From Swiss-Prot:
Keyword Chaperone recorded: no
TM annotation in the entry: 729-749, 753-773
Gene Ontology MF terms: GTP binding; GTPase activity
UniProt binding sites for GTP: 93-100
EC number annotated for this UniProt entry: 3.6.5.-
Keyword GTP-binding attributed: yes
Protein name listed in UniProt: Protein SEY1 homolog 2
Limits of the GB1/RHD3-type G domain: 83-305
Annotated compartments: Endoplasmic reticulum membrane
């Protein structure tokens, strides 16, 4: 096939007549190299040193051109401090393929690059190394290009330098031109084969970290899908690996035990320069260890101490130089291997082409019917064809390559089956979710706070069980029709996994239905209990909690029998689990009732004041009490106060159990005027979770109530004193008033105006007396006199002559008026 031009898919501007397209390309390239637009660098580029020259000599001593590797590293104290916290990266690729240019852009190095004006000769000789990054956390190796004319057919040096890079690098980049993909020599596949073999031989005695190989496809073409390029390269790699003869302990080891592979691509450097720079800057992020998508994962780190890197590199290079195990197989074996491999590749390609229709079906998301029958037949035909064509070659090689071909074919079918299984799993998962959701939506309609019947849920429990059985049966049949015989053992786990997922989905649906049923029951029972206990909370009687407990016990006995029946018929719960769920449900309902009591805390001051007034300020008929001299105010006051504080004590604790009645949260005093106080610590045996009013709330409420109690008590004493006055007027005083006021009495009777005025004033006084308003009138008169006197004194105080005198007999008292007003109120 003709070689594809690198500029085939790009459009060039018209060229000057005096320059050829080649000349202009060279000019553009040189200008790009010398242009300041190349890369914006935040620090001085690192030139690095040549650690292995073109003759294979290691930089173990200083020369006039460069220091030794040891001294170079010692001059980088920031690198020495890193210990093993750094990463190494190298690059492989053909000569003059832009490896050094790529490294310079990625790592801010200054490796020597190609100048086409001087010819396409070798620019990198041997191996160069530089430290990159602000903290010198990346070691960069620039390797001499492969397939160069300078070394002609001598491949041993490039193999050794490649193997050297594998031994020290966490990440190894392989620089490929896109048009070289698929070419065994041009794409360095022959070199990779040698690298794989020697890698196993050199490190067979120790467990070494894996190496990440990153293929960088240069000058990508627009009409070639990158996914296809990636697949082609991986197919080449897997074919190479299948031909590698590993040591005995690694016979069955897959390639990913030793290597991981990733792929990326870049546009043409000259024709799409700005796109190239932009994508290289994106690629830089992959080489940032702090990036979550970094190439520098811990499993790739070779864990070589920074201060021992120079010694390690020198020793490993000497080991590679002295390696004697690079001889090729015998000619006959080589011919057999080559031809069998070629035939195997051809048959594999034909097989791959023959199943493209099935691949398209799977790619579109459709399932292949009779997958097992279709692909088993094709694999058998391909292996039979291979035997016919290779019967003249070495039997051992034929059998070996046949086994490899069978693995490849089965691997390809296995990859297709993975997609088939993925689609089947997705379809069955969608079906499970859809059918279970339909059932869930149906039983959700049963929710009704006014009614609860567990038997209605039993119907949907049976429907869930039937649906699960049908889906499992269909899944088994579909799986058996799709799994080839050679995948039977491998796919058992997948089959069991899906069956497990179906079971999990079923158990989840049953659990959700049980939860809905339990929530339905809880809401139903709460809506039944709360209206029945609310009147007891409002009544504030001593038997409040007893009545509440009676209501709850009755409803619990009747209700939880239904819930237990629902658990038994609608779920697979055992006896202990059912008891546990019922216990949780009871706790939830009791907590909801407790919340109802807690919400009434804001009404508690009003309820307690009303309770005190009903007992102290009102009589048995509900009328305001008229205090007589013979009434025992103290006894009634303490009785009302004790009763009120008992109500407060009931609200302090959630007394849902009969044993809770024993706990006391307030202390009543009878000596002097000491106020009641709340107990600071919980009574012994009390549950803190049941406390409704904490100590601070109780204390604040009691202080408020004490003020209210004392005001009521003082008012009662004053009314009692007023009522005693009318019984204390002497009889002789009445006779003297009548005797000396007789003339005035006759004058009033004979004067109509005075008589009417006397009747009005007397009637008012009588009504006030009957209504016990004497104290109010007295206070009001005192208030008027006090205000008048205060106003007069304040006016006289403004006159300088009277100010000293007024200050002596009438000192300022801003609270005097306020206290009088408060007394009147």
């Amino acid at each position: 096939m003709d070689e594809v031009s690198p500029t085939k898919h790009f459009t060039s501007k018209p060229l000057l007549p005096t320059k050829t397209p080649r000349d202009k390309a060279i000019s553009h390239y040189v200008n790009a190299l010398n242009s300041p637009r190349n890369v914006v660098k935040t620090e001085t580029p690192e030139c690095g040193i040549q650690i292995i020259d073109g003759d294979g000599n290691f930089a173990s001593t200083d020369t006039r051109e460069r220091p030794s590797l040891k001294n170079y590293i010692l001059s980088k104290p920031e690198f020495l401090k890193r210990g093993m916290d750094y990463n190494a990266v190298g690059i492989l690729g053909a000569q003059s393929s832009g490896k050094s240019t790529l490294l310079n852009y990625l790592f801010n190095t200054k490796f020597r690059i190609l100048n086409e004006v001087m010819g396409r000769s070798r620019t990198t000789h041997g191996v160069w190394m530089a430290l990159s990054g602000k903290e010198s956390n990346i070691v960069v190796f620039d390797l001499e290009g492969t397939d160069g004319s300078a070394r002609e057919d001598d491949y041993s040096f490039e193999r050794k330098t490649s193997l050297f890079s594998l031994s020290v690098c966490s990440v190894l980049m392989v620089n490929l031109w896109s048009h070289d993909v698929g070419r065994f020599q041009a794409s360095n596949m022959s070199l990779l084969k040698t690298v794989f073999e020697l890698n196993l031989q050199l490190f067979v005695k120790e467990e070494t970290p894996k190496t990440l190989i990153v293929f960088v496809i240069r000058d990508r073409e627009a009409d070639t899908p990158f996914d296809q390029i990636e697949r082609d390269i991986m197919e080449d790699i897997m074919r190479i690996w299948d031909t590698v003869i590993p040591p005995e302990e690694f016979i069955n080891s897959p390639i990913n035990r030793f290597f991981d592979f990733q792929f990326t691509s870049l546009p043409h450097y000259e024709h799409f320069y700005e796109n190239f720079v932009e994508e290289v800057n994106l690629m830089k992020k992959k080489f940032d260890p702090k990036n979550k998508d970094t190439y520098f994962l811990p499993q790739y780190n070779k864990e070589i101490p920074a201060d021992g890197l120079s010694c390690f590199c020198e020793q490993i290079w000497e080991t590679i130089k002295d390696n004697k195990d690079l001889d090729l197989p015998s000619q006959r074996e080589m011919l057999s291997r080559y031809r069998c491999t070629e035939i195997s590749n051809q048959i594999y390609k034909e097989f791959n082409d023959s199943i493209k229709g099935e691949m398209k079906i799977l790619k579109k998301g459709n399932i292949i019917e009779d997958f097992k029958k279709v692909f088993t037949k094709q694999i058998d035909a391909a292996l039979e064809r291979y035997k016919e064509v290779t019967e003249r070659y070495m039997e051992t090689i034929v059998e070996e390559i046949e086994e490899q071909l069978k693995k490849q074919l089965c691997g390809l079918v296995e990859s297709l089956f993975e997609r088939q299984a993925e689609l089947m799993e997705k379809a069955i998962g969608k079906r499970v979710k859809g059918e279970f959701t339909i059932i869930r939506n149906e039983y959700a309609l049963l929710y009704n706070k006014k009614e609860f019947n567990p038997m209605k849920y039993q119907k949907y429990s049976q429907e869930l069980s039937r649906t699960k059985a049908v889906i499992e049966r269909d899944w088994r049949k579909q799986f058996d029709d799709s799994v080839p015989k050679f995948l039977a053992e491998k796919t058992k786990e997948k089959f069991n996994s899906v069956c497990k997922d179906i079971g999990i989905a079923y158990e989840d649906s049953v659990s959700k239905m049980t939860e809905v049923m339990k929530q339905h029951f809880g809401d139903y029972l709460e809506s039944t209990i709360k209206p029945k206990i609310t009147p007891y909370l409002e009544a504030c009687k001593k038997d409040m909690w007893k009545n509440i407990r009676n209501v709850i016990n009755i409803q619990f006995t009747n209700g939880f029998n239904k819930l237990e029946e629902g658990f038994k018929t609608c779920s697979n719960m055992n006896k202990d689990t059912i008891e546990e769920e019922i216990k949780k449900s009871k706790t939830d309902i009791l907590n909801s009732i407790k919340e109802l009591v807690i919400k009434r805390k804001i009404e508690l001051p009003y309820l307690l004041e009303r309770k005190f007034n009903n007992m102290f300020r009102f009589d048995n008929k509900g009328l305001p009490r008229k205090w007589e001299p013979t009434d025992d105010v103290d006894t009634l006051y303490f009785a009302a106060r004790d009763e009120t504080e008992d109500i407060l004590d009931m609200y302090c604790y959630f007394r849902i159990e009969e044993s809770d009645d024993q706990y006391k949260f307030t202390i009543n005093y009878r000596d002097g005027d000491l106020p009641s106080e709340s107990i600071e610590t919980l009574p012994k045996g009390a549950d803190e979770e049941k406390v409704i009013l904490n100590h601070e709330e109780r204390k604040e409420l009691i202080e408020t109530l004490n003020g209210f109690f004392e005001k009521g008590y003082l008012i009662a004493l004053r009314e009692k004193e007023n009522s005693e006055i009318k019984y204390q007027i002497p009889l002789y005083l009445i006779v003297l008033v009548v005797f000396f006021g007789f003339d005035e009495f006759i004058a009033i009777l004979t004067n109509p105006l005075l008589f009417i005025l006397t009747l009005i004033i007397g009637g008012g006084v009588y009504i006030g007396y009957k209504l016990n308003l004497g104290g109010v009138a007295k206070n009001y008169i005192q208030y008027l006199l006090s205000m008048s006197l205060s106003s007069t004194m304040e006016y006289l105080r403004t006159i300088p002559f009277f100010t000293p005198l007024i200050d002596k007999v009438w000192p300022k008292d801003d609270n005097n008026t306020e206290e009088t007003q408060e007394e009147i109120k």
